[in-house]
Amino acid sequence: LGDVYKRQVVDHHNTAGFGAGAIIAIYTQSSDRQVQSIAYSTDNGRSFIKYENNPVLVSEANDFRDPKVFWYEGTQRWVMLLAVGQEMQIFSSPNLKEWTYESSFGEGYGAHGGVWECPDLFELPVEGTNEKKWVLLCNLNPGGPFGGSATQYFIGSFDGKKFSCDNQPNVTKWMDWGKDHYATVTWSDAPDNRRIAIAWMSNWQYANDVPTSQYRSPNSIPRDLSLFAIDGGIYLQSAPSPELL
């Protein structure tokens, strides 16, 4: 079914039936179309077995990729975000095999200079308050503040099915103002409930022209993310992870 772009989860509750603690890789396979498939590992990631009934999610859309999957306690279901054209689509599943479409986000919000990619969705506390907010990361190419690739973000709420944005539709918030910052991803279950992010340090304006051998540009340093409030708005900030210092 073509090239593979993937993320993984640990199935602590054996919802997929591959065994408690199995590592499940959820990945986009790309050939004449893009579909979502899964593979599982029961030996701590040393080897993976493809699920026999792949793909688990298909679409007629040309761009249908980059799954972000996490467990949502409120509904006791898995949630998957997918980049579909210039929007993010949200699906849910009890077992990582059978997926239900829940909602879409993106039309009329933020920057739309090019295709949306590499979604992420997570909850963070707002510094100095008792409030928590959900952050939706959206990588955009082209259409960044200096052209080419960039990561924008949205602040809002999430109920397990739908993301509701607090921003006005015409407000665009950029995670980083450098040109070499794209395909941002974050890790769940980091120590002390931290949210750690890393990005690809390149830009599709010139990524294919950068001298390379076995890789295509470096990754950024890991950064801890947090939210702060100022002048009636809530914003995302980052700082180098303390392990680097």
Predicted stretch roles:
Residues 1-5:
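Short, small-residue-biased leader/transition segments that mark boundaries at the very start
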Residues 6-19, 65-74, 119-129, 185-191:
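Structural signature of eukaryotic scaffold interfaces centered on beta-propeller domains
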Residues 16-25, 75-79, 130-136, 193-197:
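Entry beta-strands of beta-propeller and related beta-repeat scaffolds
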Residues 21-113:
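Hydrophobic, small-residue-rich alpha-helical packing segments that form membrane-like cores
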Residues 30-33, 86, 141-144, 204-205:
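Short glycine/acidic-enriched loop and turn motifs that connect beta-strands
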Residues 33-39, 87-90, 145-155, 221:
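Structural motif
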Residues 103-156, 171, 175:
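Aromatic- and carboxylate-enriched substrate-binding clefts and catalytic-loop regions
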Residues 128-130, 152-245:
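Beta-rich accessory regions
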